[in-house]
Amino acid sequence: MNTEAAGRRVHVIQGEFKVVNDPDIVLSTILGSCVAACMRDPAAGVGGMNHFLLPGSATSPSSGADATRYGVHLMELLINGLLKQGARRDRLEAKIFGGARTIARFSNVGEQNAAFARQFLMDEGIRIVGESTGGDHGRKLEYWPSSGRARQYALTGVEAQRALQMDQRPAVPKPAESPIEFF
């Protein structure tokens, strides 16, 4: 039996990243104008995915819920998460997905997201081994970090509307830090 087909699914939502070293895990997400970067170190057997809404911030938030929307923050978190799990920066390889223009009358944030991801990876010296960005439809993405295999499905109709709604929904806010400790 193909272990990739039977893998345990872990969904990555907007504003999140996941790093795994379990060969039975399949990371999945649904993308409209958002972009997901999938990275791995094939020698270390570790990989992960992020899912960001916007490329970067002029104010570069360092903490709080706002930071999780931005690619600049989530790309750093993903890379650092991989390094903490034994990956080496010089062996990292990446695939990028998403960046669709889901509504013609809106600015093309999807194209900006994809361009940001490409430039960020190039600046960091991380090889891009695959890319599927742009277009007019959202995507459902599955990524097997252990092998680097990725599979996507074009979303149409109801699925596309759901992806669009997810892209327009704000990222889940993180709880505010407080000096109060509860027991």
Curated annotation (Swiss-Prot):
Pfam families: CheD. It is an enzyme of class 3 (hydrolase). The keyword Zinc does not apply. GO terms for biological process: chemotaxis. Its EC number is 3.5.1.44. Signal peptide: none annotated. It catalyses: L-glutaminyl-[protein] + H2O = L-glutamyl-[protein] + NH4(+). Keywords: Chemotaxis, Hydrolase. One of its GO terms (molecular function) is protein-glutamine glutaminase activity. InterPro entries: CheD-like_sf (IPR038592), Chemorcpt_Glu_NH3ase_CheD (IPR005659), Cytotoxic_necrot_fac-like_cat (IPR011324). It comes from the Bacteria. Belongs to the CheD family. NCBIfam families: PRK13497.1 (NF010019). Probably deamidates glutamine residues to glutamate on methyl-accepting chemotaxis receptors (MCPs), playing an important role in chemotaxis. This is Probable chemoreceptor glutamine deamidase CheD. It comes from Rhizobium meliloti (strain 1021). The gene is cheD.
